[in-house]
Curated annotation (Swiss-Prot):
Domain of life: Eukaryota
EC number annotated for this UniProt entry: 2.4.1.-
Name by which UniProt lists this protein: Probable galacturonosyltransferase-like 3
Chief localisation class: Golgi
Keywords (A to Z) from UniProt: Cell wall biogenesis/degradation, Glycoprotein, Glycosyltransferase, Golgi apparatus, Membrane, Signal-anchor, Transferase, Transmembrane, Transmembrane helix
Pathway in which the depicted protein is active: Glycan metabolism; pectin biosynthesis
Spans within the Lumenal topological domain: 29-345
GO molecular function annotations of the record: polygalacturonate 4-alpha-galacturonosyltransferase activity
Length: 345
């Protein structure tokens, strides 16, 4: 539901007076203003200009999507990044949103993070709507879930490297550590989980086709979660990765070769060809599975990023007063104030 502006007038007697006020009906939540985060002494203060074609390695670029349903998670994610960053003023956020809500979302981001350097890019849902087939969970079928495929087209050429974050995670370490990883010859860096059973990701039709399954021949069976990726956008553009991903999406639309939304095309293009990142940078699956969203425990080892991938989202479970134990780790980053039906304008 879009915001709706109404003019309400009240008739007051003795003497007769008509008093009017403009209100806005909205389905977007309100948030507390985040504190200003400043650079440490070791940081060189820089300003990023989108029209500048020179690459500045001291600026960290982070891309996320923005929409009404996951807005609370996105705000918490941004807050967590800034709170733990050594050079927060050198971080530029690139938000991807559909045109329908971009003005409202811009207002919320600006009021919640007055000191944030950010840009909002319009994503046309029609770009992927005809290429999406239904999956095991409705949230995985939303067009904005596929926006990560088009980052190289949406972001300026000057952005040669970007970190992509999902909207259901919080960072509990300095994001500069993730930014500095050496991608070497690879397009994408992400925590990898090898010895995966790929039969679980693709249908029998895929495995019965010599042409389809040959795409994975001689490839290491390595799974990676696409909610946390470091991407070399220059190499992505050179190797026409978007076209390759779209090709698999079109095949899926005709022959249904997988069930899991936007992940399988990434596996078909990148499996076994990803720069491994420490597992601490994506403690994923905290939202449980895609069907029930049951509580999960942390994986063994150190943690730099907590990711509530899966059906269960921490803000929904906290609001329902049925949180999982690990949801308490997300709560300190929640800037949610209230969800008004009517707000003054």
């Amino acid at each position: 539901m879009s915001s709706l502006r109404l003019r309400l007038c009240l008739l007051l007697l003795l003497p007769i007076t008509i008093s009017c006020v403009t209100v806005t009906l909205t389905d977007l939540p309100a948030f507390r203003e985040a504190p200003a985060f400043r650079n440490g002494r070791e940081c060189s203060k820089t300003t990023w200009i989108p029209s500048d074609h020179e690459h500045n390695p001291s600026i960290i670029h982070i891309a996320m999507t923005l929409d009404a349903i996951y807005l609370r998670g996105s705000v918490a994610g941004v807050f967590s990044v800034l709170q733990h960053a050594s050079c927060p003023e050198n971080i530029v956020f690139h938000f991807i949103a559909t045109h329908r809500r971009s003005a409202d979302l811009r207002r919320i981001i600006s009021s919640t993070f007055p000191y944030l350097t950010y840009h909002i890019y319009h994503f046309d849902p029609n770009l992927v709507r005809s290429k999406i087939s239904s999956s095991i969970r409705r949230a995985l079928d939303q067009p904005l879930n596929y926006a990560r495929i088009y980052l190289a087209d949406l972001l300026p050429i000057a952005v040669r490297r970007v970190i992509y974050f999902d909207s259901d995670l919080v960072v509990v370490d300095d994001v500069a550590k993730l930014w500095r990883i050496d991608l070497r010859r690879h397009v994408v860096g992400a925590p990898e989980y090898c010895h995966a059973n790929f039969t679980n990701y693709f249908t029998s039709r895929f495995w019965s086709s010599q042409g389809y399954k040959s795409a994975l021949k001689d490839r290491k069976p390595c799974y990676f979660n696409t909610g946390v990726m470091v991407i070399d956008l220059g190499k992505w553009r050179e190797r026409r990765v978007t076209v390759k991903l779209e090709t698999w999406m079109r095949i899926q639309k005709r022959h249904r070769i997988y069930e899991l939304g936007s992940l399988p095309p990434f596996l078909l293009v990148f499996a076994g060809d990803v720069e491994p990142v420490e597992h601490r940078w994506n403690q994923h699956g905290l939202g449980g599975d895609n069907l029930e969203g049951l509580c999960r425990n942390l994986h063994p080892g150190p943690v730099s990023l907590l990711h509530w991938s899966g059906k269960g989202k921490p803000w929904l479970r906290l609001d329902s007063r049925r949180p999982c134990p690990l949801d308490s780790l997300w709560a300190p980053y929640d800037l949610f104030r209230y969800s008004p039906l009517i707000s003054d304008s």
